[in-house]
UniProtKB/Swiss-Prot annotation:
Keyword check for Repeat: yes
Family recorded in the similarity comment: Belongs to the KRTAP type 4 family.
Organism of this sequence: Homo sapiens
PANTHER family in alphabetical order: KERATIN ASSOCIATED PROTEIN, KERATIN-ASSOCIATED PROTEIN 4-1
Protein name stated in the entry: Keratin-associated protein 4-1
């Protein structure tokens, strides 16, 4: 049985049961809904972040509280859920990009080519009708041959 919250300090008793508790049992976790004992970030004990695996401090919004989003960094302003993946949690992201692979750092530019078969061709200079190869991404080289 987990003790209920007592003001600003909570009891740690019962926190090793491996299940989410109705009442908080860890410090800084006195919220309506508690995190599971596997939560290691106190700020992740917010109700919206009470998932099996907790998010990091910078990634505690409801849509980002999945295991795949719990990375060191996350993009809160990213408009697509696929940008919550580890490879997409970068400084910049392109929400309107049609391909999940375009959420990689090199692809998170103003323009992107969703139909581009080469991930490195998602850079601005390579967003042409026909994509270049990875080693041939100059504007004048985005043709059928490089």
């Amino acid at each position: 049985m987990v003790n209920s919250c007592c003001g600003s300090v909570c009891s740690d008793q019962g926190c090793d049961q491996g299940l989410c508790q109705e009442t908080c049992c860890r410090p800084s976790c006195c919220q309506t809904t508690c995190c599971c004992p596997s939560c290691v970030v106190s700020s992740c004990c917010r109700p919206s972040c009470s998932q099996t695996t907790c998010c990091q401090t910078t990634c505690c919004r409801p849509s980002c509280c999945h295991p795949v989003c719990c990375q060191t960094t996350c993009r809160p302003s990213c408009g697509v859920s696929s940008c919550c993946r580890p490879l997409c949690c970068q400084t910049t992201c392109h929400p309107s990009c049609g391909m999940s692979s375009c959420c990689r750092p090199l692809c998170c530019q103003t323009t992107c080519r969703p139909s581009c078969g080469v991930s490195s061709c998602c850079r601005p200079l390579c967003c042409q009708t026909t994509c270049c190869r990875a080693t041939c991404c100059r504007p004048s080289c985005c043709g059928s041959s490089c």
